[in-house]
């Protein structure tokens, strides 16, 4: 009977560190719910001590998630562990993940300490974490460059202190697969109490072998793999979880292990992470790239037509990618739209049917037929923009030509006021952004502008993703329409609402902090 490999997702912690703009609490929760649907065993959702915002997002996710274990990161520092526990205590089940560096380089130059002191600190902090939960993970940072004898000493001590999972990370993506496998098997040979903990691996893709390293470690005995969806993360990224999951499934003949992942949710979860994080998936990306199941060679096409297994080691359907696209029209009713969403795997809680159907009718009137990919794009946008809006685009008009200066006029709803403005710009998009900036008086700098087609052909929806800098913080906005100028305007209005909401959250956090101080003074 095969053993289970625990899937530990760190998209919302290690993965988020690679993003140009921080995610809102709502966006993080959206990803967490997608990961829960996919069936991840553990999700690491933040570093609570780092900021009040991160604390709030961890707490919100911990309160909401019911079927996955929620985890938070903490250094081997008392305050880190205490704050992590405070943010997680509302969860059905939670884990505290604490870490300290173990390689000679990190100990000498970063910690300015000794191995004995590191071991002593690790023991104390694992025991402290165990006061809050019986599920404690301990990581030996830079384990890939730690001598095996030193590593074995740390691991044995951490297990004796109460760690239930021991993580052996290749922090800088330096280790080769055969070396990594030797580290794992070496620990099994050297650590007498290793049977009392689950051995985990966390790999980075600096040399392009994060997935290979993780699989080699599993083959050598590791029973937890840490990574992020689509491989997002610092530098070259983390181990791509969807690749590990499908490799274990497809090559079960030699891996002799399994995961409890619902692999039919992989495609949708991957798309959710890509869209919310504003990180497009390369067409040739394994498992989830648009070309992953494409065949252009005549020989390959002929072979696939005769038998798909000639050139496909897995099917698109196995990851939840439905290649049969059905279309709806403006004559399709709400029930038809709801039924199609259910067929694509969406639950009622994933979208607001009233808002989705209104957007569907507007799109159907414009382009006639609405396909599955249109519905998915509309559902995503409506989910992103379902929160109360302070700003709303009421009207816009743009005049532009090859020999004319682009001019835009807008009418923007700002709370209880309606404001109008006009401006010139270097093209229609710049003109409309200049007009919006005049209305709001926000000092916004556009950092990134991206346009992608959602669908096929000349009537495809155009999705605009932008990143702006406002007062030293990055914010992401997204807009969707058949007209790219309209998409661009909607993306900027989405950014304005995100900035406004962030300010409101900051005010609320300050209010709570002040109330806490007032209560202390009263006591």
Swiss-Prot record:
What CDD domains would the database entry show?
DRE_TIM_IPMS
Enumerate the InterPro entries for this protein. Answer: 2-IPM_HCS-like, 2-isopropylmalate_synth_dimer, AIPM/Hcit_synth_CS, Aldolase_TIM, LeuA/HCS_post-cat, LeuA_allosteric_dom_sf, LeuA_bact_synth, PYR_CT
| Gene Ontology BP annotations | L-leucine biosynthetic process
Catalyses which reaction(s)? 3-methyl-2-oxobutanoate + acetyl-CoA + H2O = (2S)-2-isopropylmalate + CoA + H(+)
Highest taxon of the lineage = Bacteria
Keywords, A to Z, come to:
Amino-acid biosynthesis, Branched-chain amino acid biosynthesis, Cytoplasm, Leucine biosynthesis, Manganese, Metal-binding, Transferase
Per UniProt, residues of the Pyruvate carboxyltransferase domain are 5-267
**Which of the seven top EC classes does this enzyme belong to?**
transferase
* EC number in record: 2.3.3.13
The cellular component terms of Gene Ontology attached to this UniProt record, alphabetical and capped at eight, are:
cytosol
Keyword check for Coiled coil, yes or no.
Answer: no
- Specify whether Transferase is a keyword of the entry: yes
Binding residues for Mn(2+): 14, 202, 204, 238
- Name any cofactors this protein relies on: Mn(2+)
Q: Which Pfam families match?
A: HCS_D2, HMGL-like, LeuA_dimer
Q: Which is an annotated GO molecular function term of this record?
A: acetyl-CoA C-acetyltransferase activity
Complex and partners? Homodimer.
Q: Tell me the protein family, please.
A: Belongs to the alpha-IPM synthase/homocitrate synthase family. LeuA type 1 subfamily.
What is the purpose of this protein? Catalyzes the condensation of the acetyl group of acetyl-CoA with 3-methyl-2-oxobutanoate (2-ketoisovalerate) to form 3-carboxy-3-hydroxy-4-methylpentanoate (2-isopropylmalate).
Q: What is this protein called?
A: 2-isopropylmalate synthase
Organism, scientific name: Klebsiella pneumoniae subsp. pneumoniae (strain ATCC 700721 / MGH 78578)
Encoding gene (name): leuA
């Amino acid at each position: 009977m095969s053993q289970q490999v625990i899937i530990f997702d760190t998209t919302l912690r290690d993965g988020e560190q690679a993003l140009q703009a921080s995610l809102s609490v709502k966006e993080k929760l959206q990803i967490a719910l997608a990961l829960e649907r996919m069936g991840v065993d553990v999700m690491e959702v933040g570093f609570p001590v780092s900021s009040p915002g991160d604390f709030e997002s961890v707490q919100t996710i911990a309160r909401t998630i019911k079927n996955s274990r929620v985890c938070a990161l903490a250094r081997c520092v008392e305050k880190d562990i205490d704050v992590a526990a405070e943010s997680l205590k509302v969860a059905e089940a939670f884990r505290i993940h604490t870490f300290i560096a173990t390689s000679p380089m990190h100990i000498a130059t970063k910690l300015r300490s000794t191995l004995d002191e590191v071991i002593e600190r690790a023991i104390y902090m694992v025991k402290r974490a165990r006061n809050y939960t019986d599920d404690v993970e301990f990581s030996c940072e830079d384990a890939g460059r730690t001598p095996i004898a030193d590593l074995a000493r740390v691991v044995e001590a951490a297990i004796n202190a109460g760690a239930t999972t021991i993580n052996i990370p290749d922090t800088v993506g330096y280790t080769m697969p055969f070396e990594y496998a030797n580290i794992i098997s070496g620990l099994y040979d050297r650590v007498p109490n290793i049977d009392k903990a689950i051995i985990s691996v966390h790999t980075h893709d600096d040399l392009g072998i994060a997935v290979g390293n993780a699989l080699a470690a599993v083959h050598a005995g590791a029973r937890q793999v840490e990574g992020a969806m689509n491989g997002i993360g610092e530098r070259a990224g983390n181990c791509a979880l969807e690749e590990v999951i499908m490799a274990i499934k497809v090559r079960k003949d030699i891996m002799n292990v399994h995961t409890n992942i619902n692999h039919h949710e992989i495609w949708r979860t991957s798309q959710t992470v890509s869209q919310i994080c504003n990180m497009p998936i390369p067409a040739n990306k394994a498992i989830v790239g648009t070309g992953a199941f494409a065949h252009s060679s005549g020989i390959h096409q002929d072979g696939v037509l005769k038998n798909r297994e000639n050139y496909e080691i897995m099917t698109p359907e196995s990851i939840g990618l439905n290649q049969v696209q059905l279309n709806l029209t403006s004559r399709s009713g709400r029930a038809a739209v709801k039924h199609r969403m259910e067929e694509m795997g969406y639950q009622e809680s994933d979208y607001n049917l009233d808002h989705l159907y209104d957007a569907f009718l507007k799109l159907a009137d414009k382009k006639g037929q609405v396909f599955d990919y249109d519905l998915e794009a509309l559902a995503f946008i409506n989910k992103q923009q379902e929160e109360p809006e302070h700003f709303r685009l009421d009207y816009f008009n743009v005049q532009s030509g090859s020999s004319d200066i682009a001019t835009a006029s807008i009418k923007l709803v700002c709370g209880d006021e309606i404001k109008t403005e006009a401006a010139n710009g270097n093209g229609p998009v710049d003109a409309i952004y200049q007009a919006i900036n005049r209305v709001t008086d926000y000092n916004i700098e556009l950092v990134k502008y991206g346009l992608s087609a959602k669908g096929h052909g000349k009537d495809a929806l155009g999705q605009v993703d932008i990143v702006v800098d406002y007062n030293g913080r990055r914010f992401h906005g997204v807009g969707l329409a058949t007209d790219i100028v309209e998409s661009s305007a909607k993306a900027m209005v989405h950014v304005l609402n995100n900035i406004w909401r962030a300010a409101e959250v900051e005010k609320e956090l300050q209010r709570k902090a002040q109330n806490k101080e007032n209560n202390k003074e009263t006591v």
